[in-house]
Amino acid sequence: MAKSILLINGPNLNLLGTREPSIYGSTTLPQVVESASSQCSRLSITFSHIQSNHEGVLIDRIHEARGNVDAIVINPGALTHTSVGLRDALVGVDIPFVEVHISNIHKREAFRHHSYLSDKAEAVICGLGTYGYEAAIEYAARHIKPKGEAQL
């Protein structure tokens, strides 16, 4: 079981609850973070979170997680479709991660169909609304082991 999880939310996710609620729902980012924190607490998992609209800030936080975090749950937002830098950071720190998207990116505009992260992710969850975060944490808790322990 993962003992520590870093939740990363990328650009524009600070607008959850007000930005295009017909696509992203009415749940706010503080509600998502509180729910994730409570879930991790129930599972005895150390939880941390960052949201930034700046790619470099997210990359720096991923670098800081190296050796300190067992798993990353990431909703990269629009960086999904554009950021080789984010991909390289995740691969470079060798921390297993689960990619989350609130909407089903494959039912949206064609430019949203490609992810620079998916082929490196342990799992990809999309289209489940904010429940996707809960599912990602549950997956990480059950299937991602701390370094040095055998993976399932």
Swiss-Prot record:
The keyword Lyase applies. Pathway: Aromatic compound metabolism; 3,4-dihydroxybenzoate biosynthesis; 3,4-dihydroxybenzoate from 3-dehydroquinate: step 1/2. The active site is at 24 (proton acceptor), 101 (proton donor). Its EC number is 4.2.1.10. InterPro entries: DHquinase_II, DHquinase_II_CS, DHquinase_II_sf. Substrate binds at residues 75, 81, 88, 102-103, 112. CDD domains: DHQase_II (cd00466). The record marks 19 as: Transition state stabilizer. One of its GO terms (molecular function) is 3-dehydroquinate dehydratase activity. Pfam families: DHquinase_II. Keywords: Lyase, Quinate metabolism. One of its GO terms (biological process) is 3,4-dihydroxybenzoate biosynthetic process. It catalyses: 3-dehydroquinate = 3-dehydroshikimate + H2O. Belongs to the type-II 3-dehydroquinase family. Homododecamer. Adopts a ring-like structure, composed of an arrangement of two hexameric rings stacked on top of one another. Is involved in the catabolism of quinate. Allows the utilization of quinate as carbon source via the beta-ketoadipate pathway. NCBIfam families: aroQ, PRK05395.1-1, PRK05395.1-2, PRK05395.1-3, PRK05395.1-4. This is Catabolic 3-dehydroquinase. It comes from Phaeosphaeria nodorum (strain SN15 / ATCC MYA-4574 / FGSC 10173) (Glume blotch fungus).
